[in-house]
């Protein structure tokens, strides 16, 4: 029974880290939210909400109705065609993350706050026409590792260090995919640091496996330069 419960928790963690958090990052950092909010105002055709009985145009209720109609027209003409579906997907992913966080141990919930901060940085970078591979690596790999650890064990500083090492390596992989400088240095140093940390923690099997993967990876890297 304990093994079945652990497998269920592991499956929920994978859903949280990969499906919910991954979707949130893709939508937050991959959608031009600020551009969608800044265009199309005022709308060419306001909305047509019905006027309340006995409402004068210059009365506060009349002014509020005109503003609501303009907002409705802007939503229909500009925002919804550009980012409406992305917004619905974002809300669905946020709801999924909230439900999974309630089902999983409470120790994982602070990670959602860290994710929200990373999402804000990703959206801000997108506004400037840039991407944020470091934030993507932290969200996908660093937080994912911590979620898996906290689901089964209390918080530990060594686990956080290992998460940073793996995120550093993932950052290098993302920079390598974008053909940016320093990618191999980040990729290799992150894995070397992770293997050294595992060896220091007297975990020879995972440390050895990671070292073997690193050796094979380094052996293939000269072909990338050519």
What are these regions (language model features)?
Residues 1, 134-152, 186-199, 226:
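Small-residue-rich segments of transmembrane alpha-helices in multi-pass membrane proteins
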Residues 2-7:
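Short, hydrophobic transmembrane alpha-helix segments
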Residues 8-33:
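Hydrophobic alpha-helical membrane-embedded segments
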Residues 17-25, 92, 96-97, 144, ...:
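Alpha-helical transmembrane segments of multipass membrane proteins
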Residues 22-30, 118-131, 172-180, 218-225:
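C-terminal ends of transmembrane helices
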Residues 42-106, 160-165, 182-217:
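Multi-pass membrane catalytic core of lipid/isoprenoid biosynthesis enzymes
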Residues 79-153:
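Intramembrane alpha-helical segments
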Residues 135-182:
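Functional transmembrane core segments of multi-pass inner-membrane proteins
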């Amino acid at each position: 029974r304990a093994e079945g419960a652990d497998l269920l928790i592991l499956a929920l963690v994978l859903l949280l880290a990969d499906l919910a958090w991954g979707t949130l990052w893709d939508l937050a950092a991959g959608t031009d939210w600020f551009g969608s909010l800044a265009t199309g105002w005022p709308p060419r055709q306001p909305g047509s909400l019905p006027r309340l009985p006995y409402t004068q145009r210059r009365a506060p209720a009349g002014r509020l109705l005109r503003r609501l109609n303009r907002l409705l027209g802007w939503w229909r003409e500009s925002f919804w065609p550009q980012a409406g579906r992305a917004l619905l997907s974002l809300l669905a992913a946020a709801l999924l993350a909230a439900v999974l966080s309630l089902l999983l141990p409470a120790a994982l919930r602070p990670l959602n706050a860290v994710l929200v901060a990373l999402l804000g940085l990703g959206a801000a970078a997108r506004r400037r026409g840039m991407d944020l591979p470091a934030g993507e690596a932290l969200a996908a790999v660093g937080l994912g590792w911590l979620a898996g650890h906290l689901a089964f064990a209390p918080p530990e500083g060594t686990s956080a260090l290992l998460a940073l090492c793996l995120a550093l390596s993932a950052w290098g992989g993302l920079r390598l995919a974008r053909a940016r400088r320093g990618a191999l240095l980040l990729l290799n140093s992150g894995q070397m640091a992770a293997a050294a940390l595992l060896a220091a923690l007297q975990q020879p099997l995972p440390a050895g496996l990671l070292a073997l993967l690193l050796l094979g990876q380094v052996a293939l890297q000269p072909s990338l330069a050519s």
